[in-house]
Each structure stands twice: as C-alpha cells, then as structure tokens.
C-alpha cells in the first residue's frame, strides 16, 4: 500500500488537527488504497513535551518510509515543514500540493 506523508503546520494549535482530519477524510474518499500519514495526529501530543530536534526526528522516522509528501500551501511554510520538505528533496521523495493531488487523483478515477 502506498504511504503518503501529510506536511502541515501544527504549532500547538488544535484547530489544525481538525483541519488535517478533514483533509484526510477527503483524501480517503478519493483513494482508500493509500495510507495517509499525519505526524500531527501521531506526535501532536508531544509538541510541547520534547525539544524540537527530537520532534523532527520522530517526523523524519515516518517520512523516510513514505512514497510521497503532500503539502498544504501556506500551512506548510513553517520551519518544521521546511525541514521535512528539504528532506524529501534530498532523498528524491516526490512533493505535491494538496489541490494538485486531489485533481490528479480525481482525473485518474474517471
């Protein structure tokens, strides 16, 4: 099963968890044969409990096993997200915008 990493800002704002949950619901409605990996859902509870370098290591441990990354425009412009994006670039993990991914997926379903 394909694994796609969702690169979205958390910053300790729990409304972002709800927003990402809504994105995941849309993504799953398009393609149920993909595992959408959300570090915010997995590690959000650690956000203010561990230092940022350890938090980054947790995120990269997930990202390195993913086939692709989806970014969310301005919501992917934080230092943490940029670190993850740079990891993808360095390791040739494809990066695509959420809107473009949805358009491409819908096009392929037709």
Show the residue positions of the predicted features.
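Conserved catalytic or regulatory cores that recognize and/or transform ribose-phosphate-containing ligands
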Residues: 1-110
């Amino acid at each position: 099963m394909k694994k796609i990493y969702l690169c979205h800002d958390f910053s300790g704002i729990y409304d972002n968890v709800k927003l990402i949950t809504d994105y995941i619901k849309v993504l799953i409605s398009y393609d149920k044969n993909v595992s959408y990996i959300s570090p915010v859902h997995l590690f959000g509870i650690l956000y203010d409990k561990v230092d940022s370098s350890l938090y980054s290591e947790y995120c990269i441990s997930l990202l390195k096993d993913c086939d692709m990354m989806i970014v969310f425009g301005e919501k992917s412009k934080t230092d943490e997200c940029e670190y993850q994006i740079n990891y993808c670039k360095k390791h040739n993990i494809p990066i695509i915008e959420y809107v473009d991914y949805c358009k491409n997926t819908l096009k392929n379903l037709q």
